[in-house]
Regions:
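Intrinsically disordered, low-complexity serine/threonine-rich segments
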Residues: 14, 19-20, 56, 60, ...
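Gram-negative (and chloroplast) outer-membrane scaffold detector with strong preference
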Residues: 83-161, 183-185, 189, 226-240
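Short glycine/proline- and aromatic-enriched beta-strand/turn motifs that initiate or cap beta-hairpins
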Residues: 21-94, 230-240
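Predominantly the C-terminal beta-signal and adjacent terminal strand-loop region
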Residues: 103, 177, 182-240
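Flexible, solvent-exposed loop segments that connect beta-strands
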Residues: 60-75, 99-124, 151-171, 203-224
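Hydrophobic alpha-helical segments of small multi-pass membrane proteins
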Residues: 129, 147-149, 172-179, 197
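Bacterial Sec-dependent N-terminal signal peptides
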Residues: 1-25
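A contiguous pocket-lining binding segment that forms or flanks enzyme active sites
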Residues: 164-184
Length: 240
């Protein structure tokens, strides 16, 4: 009888031991399955891969330093607009940016007889390829950034009553850096806020007046820093 009790006890312990092992194995398998699931926002197969964008806002040129042969610039603030596209391969990608700054001021010109009002309009056009990156914060929020190097074109136009129109241009290489935040409204549209910088220096102006060009060639010996900061709001339209 005693041996039977001992055998029964051993059998019961064996059953409980096997049951405990099965439970432990099940828990371990469940843990592995949970850990193998991609974290929310990192499953790139579920993320869009490309969009076109457009935005507008304000630009600010902090440098108004005087350069030998050229008066200090009065173009401090103006309208900034930007359009382009971005194509991603998981986190990183590439894109193209077209951005322009426009500022207008009215100045008085005195020819020795009378004072005349003139409109002085300055434009800075920038076109560049970009290297881009993005960081998914959730289902709707994404932080992104871009850095590029491209072509910078400056154009200044002066218009005055009785004076006609006079334009000057200068070309240079420049760089850009952008950081932005996007809020997804749907699978197709997102709203964005961008902060950034476009940097470069312009050289000697080319004007459409022979006499004035000769004077510029003689007196203009430096470069002007046209680096600007900007803030824009816009939209992303997902097409891929």
């Amino acid at each position: 009888m005693k041996k039977q009790v001992i055998l029964l006890a051993i059998s019961i312990l064996g059953v409980f031991s096997l049951h405990a092992q099965e439970i432990n194995k099940s828990l371990t398998q469940s843990k592995k399955e949970v850990n193998s699931q991609p974290r929310k926002g990192t499953d790139w197969n579920k993320q869009p891969i490309g969009y076109v964008f457009a935005g507008a806002g304000i630009g600010y040129i902090p440098s108004v330093e005087k350069v030998e042969g050229l008066a200090a610039s009065n173009y401090v603030t103006g309208l900034d607009w930007r359009v382009g596209m971005s194509r991603y391969y998981n986190r990183w990608g590439w894109g193209v940016l077209v951005q322009q700054f426009r500022s207008k001021q009215s100045v008085a010109f005195y020819d020795g007889v009378r004072a005349m009002a003139m409109d002085d309009i300055g434009r800075l056009l920038y076109i560049a390829p970009q290297f881009t990156g993005r960081w998914i914060l959730g289902e709707k929020l994404t932080i992104y950034g871009a850095i590029g190097w491209g072509w910078l074109r400056y154009k200044e136009t002066v218009k005055g009553s009785g004076l006609g129109e006079l334009s000057g241009t200068a070309n240079a290489l420049g760089g850009n850096f952008t950081v932005g935040l996007e809020y997804r409204l749907s699978s197709v549209v997102g709203m964005s806020v961008d902060l950034g910088l476009i940097g470069g220096e312009i050289g000697k102006l080319k004007v459409d007046n022979t006499g004035l060009q000769a004077a510029i060639d003689e007196t203009y010996t430096g470069k002007m820093d046209v680096t600007r900061l900007y803030a824009t709001v816009g939209a992303h339209i997902y097409i891929w």
